[in-house]
Amino acid sequence: IVPVNPLVAREGGQILGEAAYASVTDAAAALAAQGQKIDMVDCFRKSEDIPPLADEAVAIGAQCLWLQLGVFNEAAGLRAEAAGLQVIQNRCVKIEHARLFGGLGWMGVNTRVISAKRLRQLPY
């Protein structure tokens, strides 16, 4: 996981101990110098901010463009798909991982229907 945040990067800062980059392109270049590449671009941005990020994801050769809950941009998604990227919109990576591999119950989330509320009574 490589953080991209222009405001933090401008000050030479870090996020969770990792150097922050000003753009996806900058992050990809830094990783390429270490023999690594970005496979997935996971966007926590407003929907209207997605088109340039999708273009960067295509340009760096990412395999997947993932837009988090509440984030979707049909035009950018179609462009990325046309370039060969897998595009997921309006989904949370953590929730999907837990749904596929187990673990939703650890957070108090109903495993059949995702809800932020705990049940008032346990079903057993």
What are these language model-derived features?
Residues E96-Y124:
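A charged, well-structured terminal subsegment
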